[in-house]
């Protein structure tokens, strides 16, 4: 499955222009930390974030503003924790995938000291400001969760601002490890979803239900994000084929739909009609298009952008020829349940579409 982008929904249903230095969450949207952070990111020349954990739901909310900040030349540093595995690998992959190496992303790396700070620092041309309080980066913590956060500047309280900022710099430069590709793979491989993470996810889901009855905006989630990053890296290295092996429930069909979004002509091959129909619905949701058709016993559609084909039909010699499809017609091909490819018809399809 996939999920919707709550930040976009919030912007649609409630445009906030209210400014406050004390943010407490709850039912009053004016008290959401998210709105104040978003406004600060939009103006900042550089951004420093230190939180004990990152969750995918919160990262998704801030990605748009952070991306725009990078495009105008802002510097971004993020220091987070890896204790107890509360930081989700998908949140880190999302930052790396969407924002690239422009963000200096690090883990706190002292094993004998706890790490529970939550602070957001923004530096402008003439001054700096600092948010400090209880909110890590999760959807509920940025919106309706009961969180207490306070904002002040280096003009209103220069002494304490310098204490906090200098401590951040020391932790970032002297007590951290860079989250490069190798470190991220290691963290992801050893990661097990902690029990407390389930509670945090539940809060996010409840917050999501309260926000809107909007039409879902489908986005990758969890292991899908990690897989998409791996597929993109594989293509960057010159590979033209990839095998995705994932547990039941990951949402492999949605994953294929997300990965196909930048390709004009897509072929999805499966051995059962039920799978083809379900896949068509998933691709329709992700690509937001009705430009798809079926190639099976009842239909021989050849003119749509996305074709869902039965292996029993397409795999016949009668149809694997230029009267139906040129060998290079499709720019993206998905073979569902590839372990069936030992079947002669599957192999014929794979060999034909080079």
Protein language model regions, located:
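Hydrophobic residues on the short alpha-helix immediately C-terminal to a glycine-rich phosphate/catalytic loop
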Residues: 65, 231, 255-262, 349
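SF2 helicase catalytic motif II
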Residues: 312, 323-354
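Conserved RecA-like ASCE P-loop NTPase motor core of nucleic-acid helicases/translocases
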Residues: 52, 256, 265-272
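Conserved two-lobed SF2 helicase motor
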Residues: 303-319
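PLD/PLD-like phosphodiesterase catalytic module centered on the HKD motif
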Residues: 1-221, 225, 229, 339
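Hydrophobic positions in the central parallel beta-sheet of the AAA+
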Residues: 49, 130, 307-309, 333
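Walker A/P-loop
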Residues: 235-259
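Conserved helix-turn-beta segment of the N-terminal RecA-like "Helicase ATP-binding" lobe
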Residues: 266, 273-299
């Amino acid at each position: 499955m996939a999920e919707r982008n709550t930040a976009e929904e919030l912007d649609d249903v409630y445009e906030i222009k209210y400014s406050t230095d004390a943010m407490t969450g709850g039912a009053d949207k004016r008290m959401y930390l998210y709105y104040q952070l978003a406004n600060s990111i939009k103006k900042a020349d550089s951004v420093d974030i230190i939180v004990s954990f990152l969750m995918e739901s919160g990262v998704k909310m801030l990605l748009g503003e952070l991306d725009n900040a990078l495009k105008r030349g802002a510097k971004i540093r993020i220091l987070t924790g890896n204790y107890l595995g509360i930081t989700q690998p998908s949140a880190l992959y999302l930052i790396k995938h969407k924002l690239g190496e422009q963000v200096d992303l690090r883990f706190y790396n002292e094993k004998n000291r706890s790490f529970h700070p939550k602070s957001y620092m923004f530096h402008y041309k003439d001054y700096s400001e600092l948010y400090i309080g209880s909110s890590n980066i999760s959807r509920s913590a940025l919106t309706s969760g009961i969180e207490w956060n306070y904002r002040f500047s280096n003009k209103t309280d220069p002494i304490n601002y310098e204490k906090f900022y200098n401590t951040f710099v020391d932790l970032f430069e002297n007590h951290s490890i860079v989250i490069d590709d190798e470190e991220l793979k290691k963290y992801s491989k050893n990661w097990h979803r902690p029990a407390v993470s389930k509670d945090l996810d539940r809060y996010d889901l409840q917050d999501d239900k309260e926000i809107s009855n909007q039409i879902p905006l489908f986005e990758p989630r969890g292991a899908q994000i990690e897989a998409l990053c791996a597929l993109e890296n594989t293509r960057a290295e010159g590979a033209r084929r990839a095998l995705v092996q994932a547990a039941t429930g990951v949402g492999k069909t949605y994953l294929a739909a997300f990965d196909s979004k930048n390709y004009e002509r897509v072929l999805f091959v499966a051995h059962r009609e039920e799978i083809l129909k379900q896949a068509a619905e998933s691709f329709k949701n992700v690509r937001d298009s009705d430009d798809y058709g079926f190639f099976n016993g009842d239909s021989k559609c050849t003119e749509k952008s996305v074709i869902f084909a039965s292996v029993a039909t397409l795999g016949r010699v009668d149809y694997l020829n230029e009267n139906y499809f040129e060998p290079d017609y499709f720019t993206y091909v998905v073979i569902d349940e590839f372990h069936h490819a030992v079947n002669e018809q599957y192999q014929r399809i794979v060999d034909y579409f080079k």
